[in-house]
């Protein structure tokens, strides 16, 4: 499965859940297209799609917690009240929110759509959804 990516560099932290480039690199690592047996391997690979986000402490090298849909709704209220800095990272399909001490990411509908496209493009075994009960209903729309 290809999710739960986190790469921390002191001067260049990365707070994304599962960058598209990393998903492709991971699949390419395991699949050698010149090898006939690669077809059998591709059928076993799933792109993991998390229906949750993460909170990262800015001073830490790992996530400090999972963000569920109900928690994200509270965070959205903070954005509406101008309590937090927010932007959406369209290329990856993620919301990124800076709360001061933490950075929070959460998937957008586009996050799901992009990973479904990659699954078809790379002709792999399919997808695996993680945490269905914690996601926002809009995340199911692409299916």
Each predicted region: which residue ranges?
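Solvent-exposed, flexible loop/coil residues
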Residues: 7-9, 108-110, 136
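Stable alpha-helical elements in mature extracytoplasmic
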Residues: 19-30, 108-115, 139
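Acidic/aromatic/glycine-rich contiguous surface patches that form carbohydrate-binding/processing clefts
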Residues: 111-143
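Glycan-binding loop/region signatures in secreted carbohydrate-active enzymes
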Residues: 46-117
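Substrate-binding surface in catalytic domains of secreted glycosidases
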Residues: 1-76
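Extracellular/periplasmic catalytic domains that process cell-envelope and extracellular macromolecules
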Residues: 38-41, 97-98, 120-122
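Flexible, active-site-adjacent loop/turn segments at secondary-structure boundaries
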Residues: 3, 102, 130
């Amino acid at each position: 499965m290809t999710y739960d990516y986190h790469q921390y560099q002191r001067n260049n932290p990365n707070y994304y859940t599962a960058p598209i480039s990393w998903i492709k690199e991971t699949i390419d690592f395991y699949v050698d297209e010149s090898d006939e047996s690669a077809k059998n391997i591709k059928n076993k690979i799933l792109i993991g799609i998390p229906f949750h986000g993460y909170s990262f402490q800015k001073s830490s090298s790992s996530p400090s917690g999972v963000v569920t849909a109900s928690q994200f709704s509270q965070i959205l209220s903070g954005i509406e009240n101008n309590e937090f800095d927010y932007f959406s990272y369209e290329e990856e399909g993620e919301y990124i929110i800076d709360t001061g001490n933490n950075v929070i990411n959460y998937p957008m509908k586009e996050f799901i759509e992009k990973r479904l496209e990659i699954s078809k493009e790379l002709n792999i075994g399919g997808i695996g959804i993680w945490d269905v009960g914690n996601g926002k209903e809009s995340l199911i729309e692409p299916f």
